[in-house]
Amino acid sequence: MVRGPVAELRAFIDAALVRPVAAPQPDPPAALLRRRLVVAVSLVIGAAVLAWALRIRPGDALFYAATLALAAVWALGAVLSGRLRLGLGHTRRGARQRPVVQSLALGGLLLAVFLVGALVVARVPVLREPVDDLLDHARFGSLPVVLGITVLNGVAEELYFRGALYAALPKHAVAVTTVLYALTTVGSGIPLLVLAAAVVGLVTALQRRVTGGILGPVITHITWSAGMLLLLPPVLDLVR
């Protein structure tokens, strides 16, 4: 039976973000306590480093060091917190496998939505200027280096927020990880960055709940973030 595009989209959303593959596997009490302590310390340090990194002047080489330090905080906190699972996703045939293709599609869909929204943002100077300032790090720096750091940070953030932090929360993990992820960007002073973090955080948290692991969220995040870095500047330039 051939389904229409709307039915296909509904089935995709259900498989990617709604219907869990398997029941979660909680940590033993001692391991959970350790995870929570490591996660709490890492969150405070990471939020401070992120606020510092986003306030560094575009073109300053210190930005690279700061963002690499941030990736190290998230990744180290995640690894030290305990075991992290890759997770499994649903396939079109009802089987289970690593959610690679599904996550690439989800990241691409998320990217498309943001790029359409950027056409609106570009027409509002008070919203556009902070975004331009953030993108100046790529314009005035080395794009390949910034792209590499962007991917690295995306992986590290997912290891921490949808890996360690999610596993440390017994209840409401989707809501709490989304809110905390968004709050870490408040120090940037860029409202649209906070909004983007909330949306991406919610999507990847739902994906974490469905797949039971970090692989899907990692692929979705880096597909979106790398795409935004490469495609957002030319999209904004369309309406200059």
Predicted regions and their residues:
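Residue-level signal for alpha-helical transmembrane segments in multi-pass membrane proteins
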Residues: 49-52, 65-66, 73-81, 112, ...
